[in-house]
Curated annotation (Swiss-Prot):
Assembly notes: Homodimer. Heterotetramer of two MnmE and two MnmG subunits.
Name the UniProt record assigns to this protein: tRNA uridine 5-carboxymethylaminomethyl modification enzyme MnmG
Coiled coil regions in record: none
HAMAP family the record matches: MnmG_GidA
Similarity comment text for this entry: Belongs to the MnmG family.
GO molecular function: flavin adenine dinucleotide binding
Organism per entry: Stutzerimonas stutzeri (strain A1501) (Pseudomonas stutzeri)
């Protein structure tokens, strides 16, 4: 039968992509249905209990700037917050939070259930209604037909999901959940390129069986970072520490002796796994020269003893998993609560998508998340928001939208997927963005919130907070520009004494702030009250200090564009080029591109790598000229 109500947008799947997609469409005012096989797993963190990290936090902040849920839920569920790369420049700093699974999921559920224009229905989707190459709706497991203008598929690892523990395997979307077999079969009938990918998860450990005195404590940062632009430290639950230990020679011996029982190394698994989150057996095999690998014990929550041992993802048989765990310092008596496993699943070549994440061959059908070959909650959430927004725009009869590479990491993510595709699970890094001095996590709202408001994604409260911040930045910049310090005055002498060099001439405070040895806090301590809002103060300081670098980067980008047709020698040995990662050396060696332009379009070859190639070619050319002149 047909469901009595028609919807504008239907979202299939209630993970990180699906929840952001459904919330985005509903915020834009269209009637939205979220179909999930289990209401209790909405927003579930299927793998590690953490949000953010290098490159990933930039996506979280962009989701937040566009009114999304991930950062808000993280502030409500985060039990440890840290800033990674804190000693480096703001462009590569990244906020990372350990999250309480229960609190995070509850925060997402609350947002979903209180979102106007959004309906939730528990039922697995088995089929799509497609007529004349246009999607018309969805058929559920019990034959119920839901009709809609746009459908967003966010199926995660559920399409044809196959779970592996040792040489045994069984169908599953994740541990404890059934796979989507009928829907996977239906999608394979469509004229879309399909492949198999793999991911994995480690065994979970009972913290009561762990000797933490044998490990290194890793507390969170003080003062506590905040994830959302609207967040506050008062929202955070009690904070906890993580713990660090290491694998050892005995661990590696156990793994090496049992590789023949690994589904990965015995040929049972066909799918390609994530390069930057390898299993422990893959680490031992690929990095045989390393004596040990770090293991981070991450708490799963405040009301459970379960720990997530980040660094030992495995699909080896359970008896081997137990040996591995108990060979590690501090875990000699550890009890495994849940075994680790690998999961294979279908994904579709993202080159068959438009920039809106709508499929090229079926109008109104959008894909987001792991179905597009990505890995990670943050990558999924960002795609979900974009797909949900474009599904709503289509239902409204409006043009689609996607940020450019110079506007957002989301733009980098989509451009990489759409133009290059991926043969392995795609993870975001800051190195993938050639405009990363502009695309900082601290200015995501300044880059995107105005567009979000225009699209209908940003509510009144967020818009008011954003406008106040933007006006505060302009006001403080103007104040600093109009405030002057002269040599020989009390202020001038105080600045000279603090920084060890007298003022040579009259400066305004904005000019002084641009100097590397002067920070905003020190400046206002010497010159009088400044901006009380820390976000405004941070933005004024970063904008002022980065101004020259940003201009220089724009020039570099223009030069890179001009170097499109620079030839690469056929005999170039990429392994000898300093600074290139092993991944990029391998890919360039396999593809043997003829020009820098071709090299730049190889999946995984970053703009930074192209710059290194250009520098190497210049050095090589200069060396050859010297030889000839000699």
């Amino acid at each position: 039968m047909d469901f009595p109500s028609r919807f504008d947008v239907i979202v299939i799947g209630g993970g990180h992509a699906g929840t952001e997609a459904a919330l985005a469409a509903a915020r834009m005012g269209v009637k939205t249905l979220l179909l999930t096989h289990n209401v209790e797993t909405l927003g579930q963190m299927s793998c590690n209990p953490a949000i953010g990290g290098i490159g990933k936090s930039h996506l979280v902040k962009e989701i937040d700037a566009l009114g999304g849920a991930m950062a808000v839920a993280t502030d409500k569920g985060g039990i440890q917050f840290r800033v990674l790369n804190s000693r480096k420049g703001p462009a590569v700093r990244a906020t990372r939070a350990q999250a309480d699974r229960v609190l995070y999921k509850a925060a997402i559920r609350e947002l979903l259930e209180n979102q106007p224009n959004l309906w939730i229905f528990q039922q697995a989707a088995d089929d799509l209604i497609v007529e004349q190459n246009e999607v018309r709706g969805v058929v559920t497991q019990m034959g119920l037909r839901f009709l809609a203008t746009s459908v967003v598929l966010t199926t995660g690892t559920f399409l044809g999901g196959l779970i592996h523990i040792g040489l045994q395997n069984y169908s599953g979307g994740r541990a404890g959940d059934p796979p989507s077999i009928a829907l996977a079969k239906r999608l394979r009938e469509l004229p879309l390129r399909v492949g198999r990918l793999k991911t994995g998860t480690p065994p979970r450990i009972d913290g009561r069986s762990v000797d933490f005195s044998q490990m290194t404590e890793q507390p969170g940062d003080t003062p506590l970072p905040v994830m959302s632009f609207l967040g506050s430290r008062e929202q955070h639950p009690p904070q906890v520490s993580c713990w660090i230990t290491h694998t050892n020679a005995r661990t590696h011996e156990i793994i090496a002796a049992n590789l023949d029982r690994s589904p990965m190394y015995s040929g049972v698994i066909e799918g390609v796994g994530p390069r930057y989150c390898p299993s422990i057996e893959d680490k031992i095999h690929r990095f045989a020269d390393k004596d040990s690998h770090q293991v981070f014990l991450e708490p799963e929550g405040l009301t459970t003893h379960e720990l997530y041992p980040n660094g030992i993802s495995t699909s080896l048989p359970f008896d081997v998993q137990l040996q591995i765990v108990q060979s590690i310092r501090g875990m000699e008596n550890a009890h495994i609560v849940r075994p680790g496993y690998a999961i294979e699943y279908d994904y579709f070549d993202p080159r068959d998508l438009k920039y809106s994440l709508e499929t090229k061959v079926i109008g109104g059908l959008f894909f987001a998340g792991q179905i597009n070959g990505t890995t990670g909650y943050e990558e999924a959430g960002a795609q979900g928001l974009l797909a949900g927004a474009n599904a709503a725009l289509r239902a409204q009869g409006k043009d689609s939208w996607c940020p450019r590479r110079d506007e957002a990491y989301l733009g980098v993510l989509v451009d990489d997927l759409i133009t290059l595709g991926t043969q392995e699970p795609y993870r975001m890094f800051t190195s993938r963005a050639e405009y990363r001095l502009i695309l900082r996590e601290d200015n995501a709202d300044l880059r995107l919130t105005e567009k979000g408001r225009e699209l209908g994604l940003v509510d009144d409260a967020r818009w008011a907070a954003f406008c106040a911040k933007r006006e505060g930045i302009e006001r403080e910049e103007q104040r600093l520009k109009n405030s002057w310090v002269r040599p020989g005055t009390p202020q001038g002498d105080a600045i000279a004494e603090r920084f060890g060099s007298p003022l040579a001439r009259e400066y305004n405070l904005l000019n002084l702030l641009a100097r590397p040895e002067i920070d905003y806090q020190s400046l206002i301590e010497l010159t009088g009250p400044g901006e009380p809002d820390p976000q405004v103060a941070e933005q004024v300081e970063i904008k002022t200090k980065y101004a020259g670098y940003i201009e220089r980067q724009q020039d570099e980008i223009e030069k890179l564009r001009a170097s499109e047709n620079v030839a690469l020698p056929a005999d170039l040995d990429y392994a000898t080029i300093s600074g290139l990662s092993k991944e990029i050396q391998h890919k360039l060696g396999q593809a043997r591109p003829q020009t820098l332009g071709q090299a730049s379009r190889i999946p995984g070859v970053t703009p930074a790598a192209v710059s290194l190639l250009m520098i190497h070619l210049k050095k090589r050319s200069a060396g050859q000229q010297l030889e000839q002149s000699a």
